[in-house]
């Protein structure tokens, strides 16, 4: 079994999954990076999966699909941005040879955003970041993102490893600590991330349980987070969690 990632651009990740002679690439935004990742492991992926349709995640898809003869899978909710060969809408699971993945629709960052679960790992695209969540400035809807966080994401097992589409961990953790200055878990995670960056390494993945200890968007009821939302938008303080989530996302947009 192979699970690996490669950074491209400033902070994007593409991922490789392989088992039993079958392999897939996830979010090959840069064709050279994606093909090099597959070549480094001596595999020829037959499938390309997308967490969502933004160009920094799909920009290399056509070239990689041509080079490998690979089939492209993605959620039809983002069909205005790209056209997958196989629509994941309505599919809770997908079997790709020896690879069996669970598909969790999480609209918000884009209409067709999904989380891909494989062997205890959760590929979260731009929906759930380490210590943060994706913005909704490019075709998204913060109210729908709130529903995804409060519904399907809240129900997922805490032991799942979180593998996002970008490494925004340091600025996200700085924002989290601005809301909760005494957050020991966030401070420890930031030190870990900064040490990895200083050594030229990639940060270790977190888990959903770890995210629930540091990520403000999973901590709406924490006193520091609730107080920050109340200061920024007093009318949201007494509202339900979805309204507080939207207010927190707006606060993060201004940070």
Swiss-Prot record:
Organism this protein belongs to: Anaeromyxobacter dehalogenans (strain 2CP-C)
Subunit comment for this entry? Monomer.
Please list the GO terms describing molecular function. Answer: beta-lactamase activity; hydroxyacylglutathione hydrolase activity; zinc ion binding
Ranked from the top, the taxonomy reads: Bacteria, Pseudomonadati, Myxococcota, Myxococcia, Myxococcales
Q: Does the keyword Zinc apply?
A: yes
**HAMAP family in the record, alphabetically?**
Glyoxalase_2 (MF_01374)
Gene behind this protein:
gloB
UniProt entry keywords in alphabetical sequence: Hydrolase, Metal-binding, Zinc
- Its Enzyme Commission number(s) read 3.1.2.6
Q: Which prosthetic group or cofactor does it need?
A: Zn(2+)
Provide the protein name: Hydroxyacylglutathione hydrolase
């Amino acid at each position: 079994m192979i699970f690996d990632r490669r950074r491209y651009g400033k902070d994007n990740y593409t991922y490789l999954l392989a088992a039993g002679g079958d392999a897939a690439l996830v979010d090959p935004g840069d064709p050279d990076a994606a093909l090099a990742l597959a070549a480094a492991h001596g595999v020829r992926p037959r499938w390309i999966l997308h967490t969502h349709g933004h160009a920094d995640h799909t920009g290399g898809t056509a070239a990689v699909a041509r080079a490998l003869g690979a089939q492209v899978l993605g959620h039809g909710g983002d069909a205005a941005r790209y056209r997958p060969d196989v629509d994941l809408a309505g599919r809770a699971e997908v079997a790709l040879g020896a690879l069996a993945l669970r598909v969790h629709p999480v609209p918000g960052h884009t209409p067709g955003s999904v989380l891909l679960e494989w062997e205890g790992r959760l590929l979260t695209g731009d929906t759930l970041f380490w210590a943060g969540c994706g913005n909704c400035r490019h075709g998204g809807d913060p109210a729908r993102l709130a529903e995804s966080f409060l519904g399907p994401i809240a129900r997922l097992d805490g032991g799942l490893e979180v593998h996002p589409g970008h490494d925004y961990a340091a600025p996200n953790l700085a924002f989290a600590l601005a809301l909760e200055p005494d957050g020991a878990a966030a401070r420890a995670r930031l030190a870990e991330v900064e040490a990895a960056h200083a050594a030229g390494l990639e940060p270790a993945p977190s888990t959903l349980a770890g995210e629930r200890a540091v990520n403000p968007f999973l901590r709406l009821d924490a006193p520091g987070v609730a107080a920050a939302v109340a200061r920024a938008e007093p009318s949201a303080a007494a509202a339900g969690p979805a309204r507080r989530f939207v207010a927190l996302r707006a606060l993060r947009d201004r940070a």
